[in-house]
Amino acid sequence: METLIELYDERAIENILAPDMFRPQRIIYLCPGEIAQDRKRQEKLKAFFRRRGWTPELIFMEASLFKADRILRQLLAIGEKYPDCALDVTGGSDAALFAAGMFTAQTGAPAFTYSRKKNRFYDISGAGFADDLYCDLSYSVEDFFLMAGGTLLPGRVDNGILSKYLEDFDPFFSCFLRFRRDWTDIISYIQRISPAEYGQIPPLLVQGNYTVKGDHGARNSANEAALQELARICLIQDLTIVRDESVSFRFRDQNTRAWLRDVGSVLELYAYKACIDTGIFNDVISSAVVRWDDTVGHGSVSNEIDVMAARGVIPLFLSCKACDIRTEALNELAILRDRFGGKGAKAAIISTEPCNAAARHRAAQLGIAVIDLEELKSGQIVHRLKVIMKAQKASF
């Protein structure tokens, strides 16, 4: 097979999986008009394949979404020009699939499909090379964005340094659980006493009043027990507290400074480490920012995924919430999963609050798993992630 015919699908992975597996010299996409004319989208696909280490010839042919007879005529013309062609019927519209069936019946061209449930390719007609063939491909988080026309941008976290801090994340989260109800005030206090000048490297040494101005005119005093615990687990150093007067300490480094000044960082870092601890993911990224297309400036659309992981050809999208689970957060997560993961992608929302029945029901409707406070407190997150990715059976 030197030529592979792909029935273009709105789910990005359906357009690249068979080409990447069999690596033909030429890929012909029968696609909607907007794709056939979208040079930027086509360049993204070329960039994806280059990133994967090969440069096939890509041909984009506009095809009808609903007229099977027109699609059949196109297929027959392609078959005449490229008699070595094979047909992937994994994606595409109903009309395209109907035409593909007639094409293979008339010409004997090989046809095959991919089963996401089995993660195998199967011979449909005359494609013995694809029969019961296990898909051993593995994609990175960036690959999933690129194949869907997106771009991975730098996020709030330098993922290159996280491996140095892995042993800190569990104690950090245990500290959070102990002081969960006061956590917002604790972080707010640290923010107040550790200001920084714009454009300057923030100082690690902190000195401030014991009581500072809080939100809405309230007063916020140092939580001595929490600060002492942060010192015990070595996130801050040289802690000195003069009750009712002053507090001073030193952040361990700039990274811990950033995490201790952000309410949600503790959960995101804990979720990141949980993904690592499962041992099943080939790539994990904290704070994955994706730009939807090549538009920059005004009109550019980007979103942040708190934690994203990849296991083979299946991505996992994690949303971390240090608050109640809201419908808006569930809807946004579902949109990102569907846009950049497609069918088979997994999504879960992790909350430091108990999940109410309404939110759990909405999550189930959207196919989103829920990991809430009770499972976090009982240390079930690693097990739950394995179950979500079907790497382990659920326990009851």
Predicted regions and their residues:
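Long, low-complexity, Lys/Arg-enriched
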Residues: 1-85, 98-272, 277-282, 288-302, ...
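Glycine-rich anion-binding loop/nest that anchors nucleotide
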Residues: 5-9, 89, 319-321
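Trp/Phe/Arg-rich N-terminal binding region typifying the photolyase-homology
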Residues: 86-93
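Conserved catalytic cores of phosphodiester-cleaving nucleases, focusing on short active-site segments
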Residues: 275, 307-309, 315-324, 333
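Anionic group-transfer/hydrolysis microenvironments
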Residues: 90, 289, 306-308, 321, ...
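Short Gly/Pro-enriched loop/turn and capping motifs at secondary-structure junctions
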Residues: 94, 323-325, 353-357
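Glycine-rich, small/acidic residue-mixed loop/short-helix segments
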Residues: 329
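Short, glycine/charged-rich beta-strand-loop motifs at protein surfaces that mediate ligand recognition
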Residues: 319-321, 347-350
